[in-house]
Amino acid sequence: FLLLTFGALLNIVTTDNIGTLASQWEVMTWASFALVAWERTSKARDAAIKYVVLCCSAAYLMIVGFFMIGGNHTQYGEIVANLSVHSDDVLKFALVFTLLGFAAKAGLVPLHSWLPDAHPAAPSSVSAPLSGVLTKMGVFGVVTLCNSWLEDLPDYQNADAYNTAQPTMVY
């Protein structure tokens, strides 16, 4: 399951296709679910269930967010190029939904409740990649979205978005 997780991680960072990203995101989540539940104790099972429910729910919101703005486009570059055709309300909802999907995996507040349970429940050989790589995949998604979707905002709104994110990084 560890190699499956790492393969999905590699596919996520190298793809420009939203369908591939979504499918590999789910592969990463379910493979890491199996790794967290590996010990087969009640603590590990509960932690794994909490992890998969929270991360899958948020990932489904992320997929909805991409569908809201994607339309007939599946390439990330095409979606970003066509952001101007959508109303501000659609863009706001799509951004929030998509950020929630990435934020849950990154363990950002208030979607971080799975972290304290999953790390001690997982074997030590899994806990390190879980904290060192998997959670950073969520950060990768947040940074990618902010750099591509928020670049056209006026400077004060862009600064507000980043200033709102900074306390989350510290907490």
Where are these regions (language model features)?
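Internal transmembrane alpha-helices of multipass membrane proteins
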Residues: 1-60, 123, 132, 137, ...
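Alpha-helical membrane-protein architecture signal
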Residues: 4, 93-96, 126
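Juxtamembrane/interfacial segments at transmembrane-helix boundaries in multi-pass membrane proteins
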Residues: 27, 58-118, 139-171
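Juxtamembrane helix-boundary/capping and inter-helix hinge elements in multi-pass membrane proteins
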Residues: 39-45, 73-74, 116-126, 151
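Short, surface-exposed, polar/charged, turn-prone segments marking secondary-structure boundaries
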Residues: 50-51, 126, 156-157
